[in-house]
């Protein structure tokens, strides 16, 4: 999956939208997303507000400040657990499958993802993601988060993120 997902992110000219229930990116994935955002692309990340793994939720949130500073717009979906795994690049590239955006899916698990280079499929995926974004809350940059309640658990989870 990283070989499948990296080129569309690097080649995108207008937008990169990523939807994943488990967001625990490695350095290359973080660099791809932040570079795209710093390059002026519309980069959006949609994750569940609460995952079925609290440790994964903390690990994901530990990366938010870095991504927000680069210009990535992050949304937390709340009505229910989000299980969608999709990447949309520009108006013609869409990847869907079983792979989460985490090291475990990229390196350990047997995952299947399919890349579509088709404007109709990409338009349909953009509509589906757009509907989910309307039901999500955009994350705001918050430097003054409580140490014990959020920053410390996030830092601990980030240390474990290569294992998640």
Report the location of each language-model feature:
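Active-site cores of enzymes that catalyze phosphoryl transfer or operate on phosphate-rich substrates
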Residues: 1-4
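PLD/PLD-like phosphodiesterase catalytic module centered on the HKD motif
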Residues: 12-18, 22-164
């Amino acid at each position: 999956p990283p070989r499948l997902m990296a080129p569309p992110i690097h080649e995108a000219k207008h937008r990169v939208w990523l939807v994943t229930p488990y967001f625990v990116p490695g350095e290359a994935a973080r660099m791809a997303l932040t570079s795209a955002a710093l390059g002026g692309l519309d980069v959006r990340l949609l994750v569940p507000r609460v995952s079925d793994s609290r440790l994964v939720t903390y690990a994901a949130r530990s990366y938010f400040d870095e991504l927000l500073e680069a210009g990535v717009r992050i949304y937390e979906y709340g009505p229910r657990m989000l299980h969608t795994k999709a990447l949309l690049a520009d108006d013609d590239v869409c990847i869907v499958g079983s792979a989460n955006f985490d090291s475990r899916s990229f390196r350990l698990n047997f995952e299947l993802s399919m890349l579509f280079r088709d404007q109709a499929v990409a338009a349909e995926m953009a509509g589906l993601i757009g509907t989910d974004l309307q039901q999500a809350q955009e994350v705001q940059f918050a430097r003054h988060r409580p140490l014990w309640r959020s920053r410390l658990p996030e830092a601990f989870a980030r240390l474990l993120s290569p294992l998640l």
